[in-house]
Amino acid sequence: MIAVSGGGTGGHFFPALAFTNYVLKKEKVKFIGSKRGIEYELKDLIKTEKLFLDVEPLRERNFYQKLKAIWKFLKAQEEINEFLKEDYRALIFGGYASLPLGINTVLRRKELFIHEQNSIPSKTNKILSKKAKKVLITFNYTKRFFPEGVRVGLPIRKELKKKLPKKEVKKRFGLEPDKITVLIFGGSQGALFLNELARDLKSVLPKEFQVILLTGKIHYEKFKNLEGEKFRVMPFSLDMGLIYSASDVAISRAGAGTINELSHFGVPSVFVPYPYAVDDHQFYNAKEIEKLGGGLVLRQEEAKPDKVLSALKEIVKNLERYSENIKKFFAEGAEERMYEELLG
């Protein structure tokens, strides 16, 4: 039996979910997450036995808050012991939600496997890696931290695997099939900076460009008035496969999930990494793609409309090459590779 844990954010949860659903066809699997994370909101997507713990991150808390978090962590150990009575091996995907299972696995001397999504490992994964049987990685840069790390890639959601004809999907969005479609988005929550950038770009975009802007739910009301002839504005999309299929190039953040999905669909990007990401990991994620020739990277303070437009034009000028290069990052069959590593 395999115990899987990963959550808190979509970046940790969705790969864990994809792996869990894959393993269900092979052997018994149980999922452990947090009641505070996105995994609890989306618990109906987890088609196996699941346990949600009342745990919270330790970072940036005062003494009493940390004491409370530690008490919750100890209580979680009892719940995990009750939930995992049979023999198991564990795969954790990082984030505070997976630390309780990681510690439990070490204390019970079970086999622990770690998957690191980002170029720079999370604090949880750094702590637990010393006791792990194997560390599985997504970015080659991560080998600086885990020299023995095995690159398996990042699992992708089943609904994103199907690619659709680009011109046909553009028409479904009411866009011109032969114009360059620029996808502007900041991940599942949206990004205020990228929404403002989209607003500033609207008046200077060349006529051969059109835009799909995903604002994020909390920003939609502020930016919905950008909707127009060459601008499609949505809070978010439940079918990102359609969005990616319609897109030629993107302006995006550089989370591991975003990069993985763009690479699957061959959509190169002007990456504007989130400047406050822990250890600046989004910047290093994006630089790996830039080195592959699959995108260009601009720091947020550099990302003025003229510079972004210049970067877009550079990519579009060599669109086929950039598209093929970003595809090189995607590791087909990541779930299967991960499972094989757990068996081996």
Curated annotation (Swiss-Prot):
GO terms for cellular component: plasma membrane. UDP-N-acetyl-alpha-D-glucosamine binds at T9, G10, G11, N118, R157, S188, Q282. GO terms for molecular function: glycosyltransferase activity; UDP-N-acetyl-D-glucosamine:N-acetylmuramoyl-L-alanyl-D-glutamyl-meso-2,6-diaminopimelyl-D-alanyl-D-alanine-diphosphoundecaprenol 4-beta-N-acetylglucosaminlytransferase activity; undecaprenyldiphospho-muramoylpentapeptide beta-N-acetylglucosaminyltransferase activity. Its main location: membrane. CDD domains: GT28_MurG (cd03785). The keyword Protein biosynthesis does not apply. One of its GO terms (biological process) is regulation of cell shape. It is an enzyme of class 2 (transferase). Cell wall formation. Catalyzes the transfer of a GlcNAc subunit on undecaprenyl-pyrophosphoryl-MurNAc-pentapeptide (lipid intermediate I) to form undecaprenyl-pyrophosphoryl-MurNAc-(pentapeptide)GlcNAc (lipid intermediate II). HAMAP family: MurG. This is UDP-N-acetylglucosamine--N-acetylmuramyl-(pentapeptide) pyrophosphoryl-undecaprenol N-acetylglucosamine transferase.
